Design a protein with these regions (language model features):
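PLP-dependent amino-acid enzyme catalytic core
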Residues: 1-311
C-alpha cells in the first residue's frame, strides 16, 4: 500500500490445494463427467498448475489421468503431478505443442480432454473467485488478473461485471507473451512466437476462442509487465508478506508496484499460483538482493600459481 499509493488486498489463490486457482476449474469439470467418460479417463495439457489440478481432482474421483507437459516444464511441477498419481507424458517445447499431443491421446484412448482454459465449465468455476472478492470487498475499485489463455480473466469478468459493472478488471500479460493483447488489438485470435519469460504459467502462444470472446467484450484494459518487474514483486511478497508466489502469480502486483496506476483506489491483485522451481527461486532471491544493493558479487581473475590470492 505504501509503495503503490493504493489500498491493496491480496487474493491468495497460491494457498489453494495444489498451489493455484486451477483446482477450481479442474475439479468442477471432472465432477460433471458421465459414468462412461469416467471409465475412459481424462487427459490434459499443461505447463504445470492445471496439470496438478487435474491430477489431484482425478485422484479424488478415482479416475485415470494422463497429463502432457512440455519438455522444459518445471521439474517441481512434473514431480508434483506424478505425485498425485497421474501418468505424465513430456512432449513439445511449449503448451501448444503439448496440447496437440493431448488431442492425439484423447482420440486413441477415448479419454475426455480437460482443457486448461477454453471450456465453459472451467471458466465458470474460475469465476467464483470474482464472486468471493465482491462478497468480501464490496467496494473494490479494480482487480488485476494474470492472463495466459484467459480462463481466469474470463470467469472473473463474467462474475464481476454481472454484480458490479463499475469495477475495473485489468488483465496482465508478460511482455514476452502478449497473445491476448495482440488478439484484442487485431480483433481476431492471434498466434505469437513468444520469447523467454520466467512467468511460464502465462506463456501461451494462442488464447482460447471462448475466453477471447468474453475478454474482448468485457475487459477494461490489458497491460504488460517484464521479468524484472515480476521478480521485484515476488521479492517484495517474500519479504513483506512472507509469501512465496510464482512469477505468473505475481504479474498483477508487479504492474501495481512498477507503474503505481491507481492512487487512492482499493485494488485486488490475484496471486494465482505459488508453484515455483527452487533453483529459479534462489536466482530470484539473489537478483532481488543485488537490485536492492544488499548483495554484491565480486569476480577476480587469478593467475594459476601458488600465492596468487595473497598477491
Amino acid at each position: 500500500t505504501q509503495i503503490t499509493g493504493s489500498t491493496i488486498y491480496l487474493k491468495n489463490e497460491f494457498e489453494q490445494k495444489t498451489g493455484s486457482f486451477k483446482l477450481r476449474g479442474a475439479y468442477y469439470k471432472i465432477k460433471t463427467l458421465s459414468e462412461e467418460e469416467r471409465k475412459n479417463g481424462v487427459v490434459a495439457a499443461s505447463a504445470g498448475n492445471h496439470a496438478q489440478g487435474v491430477a489431484y481432482a482425478s485422484a479424488l474421483e478415482k479416475i485415470n489421468c494422463t497429463i502432457v507437459m512440455p519438455k522444459n516444464a518445471s521439474p517441481a511441477k512434473v514431480a508434483a503431478t506424478r505425485g498425485y498419481g497421474a501418468t505424465v507424458v513430456l512432449e513439445g517445447k511449449n503448451y501448444d505443442e503439448s496440447w496437440i499431443k493431448a488431442q492425439e491421446i484423447a482420440k486413441t484412448t477415448g479419454a475426455t480432454i480437460i482443457h486448461a482454459f477454453d471450456d465453459s465449465q472451467i471458466i465458470a468455476a474460475q469465476g467464483v473467485i470474482g464472486l468471493e472478492i465482491i462478497e468480501q470487498l464490496s467496494d473494490v475499485d479494480e482487480i488485476y488478473v494474470p492472463i495466459g489463455g484467459g480462463g481466469l480473466a474470463a470467469g472473473i469478468l463474467v462474475a464481476i461485471k454481472d454484480k458490479n459493472p463499475n469495477v475495473k478488471v485489468i488483465g496482465v500479460e508478460s511482455k514476452s507473451f502478449p497473445s491476448m493483447k495482440k488478439s484484442l488489438d487485431s480483433g481476431k485470435l492471434e498466434t505469437i512466437e513468444g520469447g523467454f519469460t520466467v512467468a511460464d504459467g502465462i506463456s501461451v502462444r494462442t488464447p482460447g476462442e471462448q475466453t477471447f470472446e468474453i475478454i474482448k467484450d468485457k475487459i477494461d484494459e490489458i497491460v504488460l509487465v517484464d521479468d524484472d518487474e515480476i521478480i521485484n514483486a515476488m521479492f517484495l511478497l517474500m519479504e513483506r508478506s512472507k509469501s512465496v508466489v510464482e512469477p505468473a502469480g505475481a504479474a498483477g502486483l508487479a504492474y501495481l508496484v512498477s507503474k503505481k496506476p491507481s492512487p487512492g483506489k482499493k485494488v485486488v491483485p490475484i496471486l494465482c499460483g505459488g508453484n515455483i522451481d527452487m533453483y529459479l527461486l534462489g536466482q530470484i532471491v539473489a537478483k532481488g538482493l543485488a537490485t536492492m544493493g544488499r548483495m554484491v558479487k565480486i569476480f577476480i581473475l587469478l593467475k594459476d600459481k601458488p600465492g596468487a590470492l595473497k598477491e
